[in-house]
Amino acid sequence: MEAVIKVISSACKTYCGKTSPSKKEIGAMLSLLQKEGLLMSPSDLYSPGSWDPITAALSQRAMILGKSGELKTWGLVLGALKAAREEQVTSEQAKFWLGLGGGRVSPPGPECIEKPATERRIDKGEEVGETTVQRDAKMAPEETATPKTVGTSCYHCGTAIGCNCATASAPPPPYVGSGLYPSLAGVGEQQGQGGDTPPGAEQSRAEPGHAGQAPGPALTDWARVREELASTGPPVVAMPVVIKTEGPAWTPLEPKLITRLADTVRTKGLRSPITMAEVEALMSSPLLPHDVTNLMRVILGPAPYALWMDAWGVQLQTVIAAATRDPRHPANGQGRGERTNLNRLKGLADGMVGNPQGQAALLRPGELVAITASALQAFREVARLAEPAGPWADIMQGPSESFVDFANRLIKAVEGSDLPPSARAPVIIDCFRQKSQPDIQQLIRTAPSTLTTPGEIIKYVLDRQKTAPLTDQGIAAAMSSAIQPLIMAVVNRERDGQTGSGGRARGLCYTCGSPGHYQAQCPKKRKSGNSRERCQLCNGMGHNAKQCRKRDGNQGQRPGKGLSSGPWPGPEPPAVSLAMTMEHKDRPLVRVILTNTGSHPVKQRSVYITALLDSGADITIISEEDWPTDWPVMEAANPQIHGIGGGIPMRKSRDMIELGVINRDGSLERPLLLFPAVAMVRGSILGRDCLQGLGLRLTNL
């Protein structure tokens, strides 16, 4: 094969130039053609009659497997062979120019029967015949200056006409001193001794025939035999079906690879890219029906396996239909032998049932390729049916979710859907514009029109987020990480100190101002008919905050004693700690972040709301529209809120809530811990308990 590769490579370099294939590519192509049965020997490639079948077979293989490397190499080789043929560069002339010419030799004499076969070996690529003129020119006597052809002069006496020698009609013995037979050791030794070979010995080695006698058989071409043995040896590839010296053989799959694939399917699922990559790698080489069915039975459950069997049968029926229309289909063995059928492809024919060795021996290479490709396509269909992807239209970016995480969920859902590949990118970009947070939507709206792919949109948003101010999710994450140690310290201190029933930390009492209990548990609470109650504004007795005469002067602040429900004492004297421009002149609205500090698992740990600063409300009330549905609440001691419109049912948060006010520049005020009330009101209200805890006073600055 090496000699054929060298000849073809030289021709390709001559006629193809820089695009000529390498010797490695030519050797791989020749090995494939021999394996498919398209060439009995590499030298058969010189025959123009084999060119069209080779082109058809490689084209069909490229369409089935999607691999066009061998087809491209064959196209270059075919062009070189056709160019050489058009220039009428025959094989005899090429061998003559390269010094590789040979000739027929009669059967050896008795003296040569005992010689080893290596002495009779000839180089690969030699022709068994040669023209009479060339042969006689080589066998001219050494003392003659000009070669003499047979029929014009006698070999012994040199007479041109009228020779009566008995050997006049016989051709001379072959010239054994040429370099055409480098392995003939006996001839080389005789030449090394410096003596001419006797004519008798020459005749005994290769006795010439007489006139009219048929030429003897050629010597065995051991170079060609060596090529045949090398071509039938096991290839250096990892295939379940290998070709050995004694014929095709079946080798089992690696158990570790199957175990790892089964674990990947169980942990990652059928639609995972890792699973698909491992399945494609394991089925990259032809598999027997025995291996295919057992592999799918291991990695698939009962229901997916039943779906796969049906899908595999449909794919095999497609192969059979194509093979029926084309007699030279690869599954039909290029027209040699019987046509393929469903029983053969499923391994149910005679001699194949439950017998992998029989399947390896009886199935053609084209059938093995079709079986494996159909099984892989059926597996892809089952993966889409057994594990459908979630609806991409319902995916939205959460309040505290980063844009990258949102993009990951969206792209995974879109790629797992049934959308055509050409429509996936526009759908992803449209979801970025509609399903992301408002600040991200604003960035995407201001993006240049040249950004047309999801990757460009993601990169643009990430670059802008690096230079833009903190977003809501960034503020929530930063505040949560900074306040969490302080929250735990406060909770631990309250547990170690003053606790009420149930072990829950208590704030300040609204009646007596003492810590450790609520107003409902206050021992000094006003009895029915008792007019001695404490004012929450001036700390006086006998009246309440609504009746206090100092209400207009201090806006409900008590001099000398803070009423914060959190761990921070109230400022003395009260001062403005929050300076901001309200969104409305007549209604002081602020942006607030609420963080649940409890251990109860919730979907969203932080939410953003808009609340009204109301110094006339005793407590902070969160509207049920703003309150997350999965945040736990409990019944309050006072089940109603009394206002101008009457009583409103009220509940209370079971977990401690961290409340922070966000300024216009994105900065945060000092957070506050409290248990807010939850009621069906039109908007959330920050009452006096929150204002006092923040040290806030509303004025007309």
From Swiss-Prot:
Chain intervals with Basic and acidic residues compositional bias: 128-141
Region annotated Disordered, chain positions: 128-150, 181-217, 543-575
One Gene Ontology term of the molecular function aspect: aspartic-type endopeptidase activity
Any one GO BP annotation for this protein: proteolysis
Residues marked Cleavage (site): 155-156, 166-167, 177-178, 239-240, 476-477, 479-480, 488-489, 577-578
Root EC class: hydrolase
Documented EC number(s): 3.4.23.-
Domain of life: Viruses
CDD domains: HIV_retropepsin_like
Record-level GO cellular component terms: host cell nucleolus; host cell nucleoplasm; host cell plasma membrane; membrane; viral capsid
Signal sequence, renumbered to the chain: none
A Pfam family of this chain: RVP
Region of interest called Involved in capsid protein dimerization, as start-end residue ranges on this chain: 217-259, 290-298, 351-362
Site residues (Involved in capsid protein dimerization upon acidification), renumbered to this chain: D418, D430
Keywords: Aspartyl protease, Capsid protein, Host cell membrane, Host membrane, Host nucleus, Hydrolase, Membrane, Metal-binding, Protease, Repeat, Viral capsid assembly, Viral capsid maturation, Viral matrix protein, Viral release from host cell, Virion, Zinc, Zinc-finger
Active site: D614
Extent of motif PPXY motif: 172-175
Peptidase A2 domain segment(s): 609-690
ZnF bounds (CCHC-type): 507-524, 533-550
Family annotation (InterPro entries): Aspartic_peptidase_AS, Gag_M, Matrix_HIV/RSV_N, Peptidase_A2_cat, Peptidase_aspartic_dom_sf, Primate_lentivir_Gag_pol-like, Retropepsin-like_cat_dom, Retropepsins
SUPFAM superfamilies (alphabetical): Acid proteases, Retroviral matrix proteins, Retrovirus capsid dimerization domain-like, Retrovirus capsid protein, N-terminal core domain, Retrovirus zinc finger-like domains
Motif (Nuclear export signal): 219-229
Entry's free-text remark on domains: Capsid protein p27: Proton-driven dimerization of the C-terminus facilitates capsid assembly.
Identification of the protein by name: Gag polyprotein
